[in-house]
Amino acid sequence: MLNIEQIKEIIPHRYPFLLVDKILEVDEGKRAVGIKNVSANEEFFNGHFPDYAVMPGVLIVEALAQVGAVAVLKKEENRGRLAFFAGIDNCRFKKQVRPGDQLRLEVEMTRVRGPIGKGKAIATVDGEIACEAEITFAIGDKKE
């Protein structure tokens, strides 16, 4: 298990754009499972929507991508590098995510060739699928 401080050592995201609270499982370079506790105090709820708060789908996908990045960047050869979100296919939103929900974020790498990879991503709330997608990422270095 990884806590928030350990996650911040792996991926560069910070508040308000760090969308993973903890990692429950990680199989380096292959798979990770994370948790996002969705609070009523999230900034995005101010405008999405003021009278009926729903987590934006793009942020659910971003949370999945961050969990995938942890899996990929935990691999020894990728430590200190960045995982860039490069694409999304077959994305479907099946359940609204509301304040008080706990998102379980699972990403499993399905194909990796050199610096490019694909993963199957599923976000669930109480065992029900909220979002599923195939995400593509690219491993790169920081440019000075």
Swiss-Prot record:
InterPro entries (alphabetical): FabA_FabZ, FabZ, HotDog_dom_sf
Catalytic residues identified in the record: H48
Cited CDD domains: FabZ
One Pfam family this sequence matches: FabA
Chief subcellular location: cytoplasm
Protein's UniProt keywords contain Lipid biosynthesis: yes
Biological processes annotated in GO: fatty acid biosynthetic process; lipid A biosynthetic process
EC number: 4.2.1.59
GO cellular component, one term: membrane
Enzyme class: lyase
Reactions catalysed, as given in the entry: a (3R)-hydroxyacyl-[ACP] = a (2E)-enoyl-[ACP] + H2O
Cellular compartment(s): Cytoplasm
Gene Ontology MF term list: (3R)-hydroxyacyl-[acyl-carrier-protein] dehydratase activity
Sorted UniProt keywords: Cytoplasm, Lipid A biosynthesis, Lipid biosynthesis, Lipid metabolism, Lyase
Family matches, as Gene3D superfamilies: Hotdog Thioesterase
HAMAP family: FabZ
Family: Belongs to the thioester dehydratase family. FabZ subfamily.
Function statement: Involved in unsaturated fatty acids biosynthesis. Catalyzes the dehydration of short chain beta-hydroxyacyl-ACPs and long chain saturated and unsaturated beta-hydroxyacyl-ACPs.
The protein, known as: 3-hydroxyacyl-[acyl-carrier-protein] dehydratase FabZ
Annotated source species: Bacillus cereus (strain AH187)
Name of the coding gene: fabZ
